[in-house]
UniProtKB/Swiss-Prot annotation:
<comment type="similarity">
    <text>Belongs to the G-protein coupled receptor T2R family.</text>
</comment>
<dbReference type="Pfam" id="PF05296">
    <property type="entry name" value="TAS2R"/>
</dbReference>
<keyword id="KW-0325">Glycoprotein</keyword>
<keyword id="KW-0807">Transducer</keyword>
<feature type="transmembrane region" description="Helical; Name=5">
    <location>
        <begin position="185"/>
        <end position="205"/>
    </location>
</feature>
<keyword id="KW-0472">Membrane</keyword>
<keyword id="KW-1133">Transmembrane helix</keyword>
<feature type="topological domain" description="Cytoplasmic">
    <location>
        <begin position="104"/>
        <end position="131"/>
    </location>
</feature>
<feature type="topological domain" description="Extracellular">
    <location>
        <begin position="72"/>
        <end position="82"/>
    </location>
</feature>
<dbReference type="GO" id="GO:0005886">
    <property type="term" value="C:plasma membrane"/>
</dbReference>
<protein>
    <recommendedName>
        <fullName>Taste receptor type 2 member 8</fullName>
    </recommendedName>
</protein>
<feature type="topological domain" description="Cytoplasmic">
    <location>
        <begin position="206"/>
        <end position="239"/>
    </location>
</feature>
<comment type="function">
    <text>Receptor that may play a role in the perception of bitterness and is gustducin-linked. May play a role in sensing the chemical composition of the gastrointestinal content. The activity of this receptor may stimulate alpha gustducin, mediate PLC-beta-2 activation and lead to the gating of TRPM5.</text>
</comment>
<feature type="glycosylation site" description="N-linked (GlcNAc...) asparagine">
    <location>
        <position position="167"/>
    </location>
</feature>
<feature type="transmembrane region" description="Helical; Name=4">
    <location>
        <begin position="132"/>
        <end position="152"/>
    </location>
</feature>
<dbReference type="InterPro" id="IPR017452">
    <property type="entry name" value="GPCR_Rhodpsn_7TM"/>
</dbReference>
<feature type="topological domain" description="Cytoplasmic">
    <location>
        <begin position="29"/>
        <end position="50"/>
    </location>
</feature>
Length: 309
């Protein structure tokens, strides 16, 4: 029998899963239809499509991981299912983080203004740069997940041997750390692409500040289009920073939940909060992206008309 906390956890995480799949699936579908109609895809749509696919994978593996850990902990710790789930989690996590970083760097290169030769070259070759970056994102994520799988396999064999030998000391560690995997701690190093995103964010804010100063010299009332684009990009990047901070903190909570008396509750809470990152940021992208937002509004309008008819 599940406890009330388990029931609440399953309901919440199922709701997050549905919203996450619908939100990210909507972005992928809109971009795919637009690609079919125009026979080409813009760089921003290409990045977003890759991003939401990685987030669908991330949300799916996080939901499976959360349910198995919280509801069936014995199955998780006593089988090789742990290796498979955590390897896919690492791959999806790193891929998602690096593609999001690619998106933030794209915003900076596309919107910001600078006279630096390197910046001008990257801005001119942005389409080629983005495609190479995305290829690099996939390669890095695959390499990291393979290394993580090896580390986790070694850890699994070590604890199996310790348990088999009935060594008191090792058995103590095995029994006291059911939710602590090297892979979870390994995923915390995804802060590296986050730092790159943070640098892009501050450079974009600096560009907006300089642009605003120039506007004031000639200025007239209202915002110019460039300022609006700056502000929209900064809103998107700010939401990413905030949601990733929650994701990072919740990952730390899950990682060290074995130290807490109510570790199962800590794991459930951490998983629920962590999924808000790939779910919430994609919903914010829909709201702040003109094409995605207008398409959604047209869908609602058509549905209302159909209901009236």
């Amino acid at each position: 029998m599940f406890s009330p906390a388990d029931n609440i956890f399953i309901i919440l995480i199922t709701g997050e899963f549905i919203l996450g799949i619908l939100g990210n699936g909507y972005i992928a579908l809109v971009n795919w239809i637009d690609w079919i109609k125009k026979k080409k895809i813009s760089t921003i749509d290409y990045i977003l499509t890759n991003l939401v696919i990685s987030r669908i994978c991330l949300i799916s593996v996080m939901v499976v991981n959360g349910i198995v850990i919280a509801v069936y902990p014995d199955v998780y710790t006593k089988s090789k299912l742990q290796i498979a789930i955590c390897t896919f989690w690492t791959f999806a996590n790193y891929l998602n983080m690096w593609i999001t970083t690619c998106l933030n760097v794209f915003y900076f290169l596309k919107i910001a203004n600078s006279s630096h030769p390197l910046f001008l070259w990257l801005k001119q070759k942005i389409d080629m740069v983005v495609r190479w970056i995305l290829l690099g994102c996939f390669a890095i994520s695959l390499l990291v997940s393979l290394i993580a799988a090896i580390v986790l396999s070694y850890d699994y064999r070590f604890h199996a041997i310790a348990k088999h030998k009935r060594n008191i000391t090792e058995m103590f560690h095995v029994s006291k750390r059911p939710y602590f995997e090297p892979l979870t701690l390994f995923n915390l190093f995804a802060i590296v692409p986050f730092i790159v995103s943070l640098i892009s964010f501050f450079l974009l804010v600096r560009s907006l500040w300089r642009h605003t100063k120039q506007i004031k010299l000639y200025a007239t009332g209202g915002r110019d289009p460039s300022t609006e684009v700056h502000v929209r990009a900064i809103k998107t990047m700010t939401s990413f920073i905030f949601l990733f901070f929650l994701y990072y903190i919740s990952s730390i909570l899950v990682t060290f939940s074995y130290l807490m008396t109510k570790y199962k509750l800590a794991v459930e809470f951490g998983e629920i909060v962590a999924i808000l990152y790939p779910l919430g940021h994609s919903l914010i992208l829909i709201v702040l992206n003109n094409k995605l937002r207008q398409t959604f509004v047209r869908m609602l309008t058509c549905r209302k008309i159909a209901c009236v008819i």
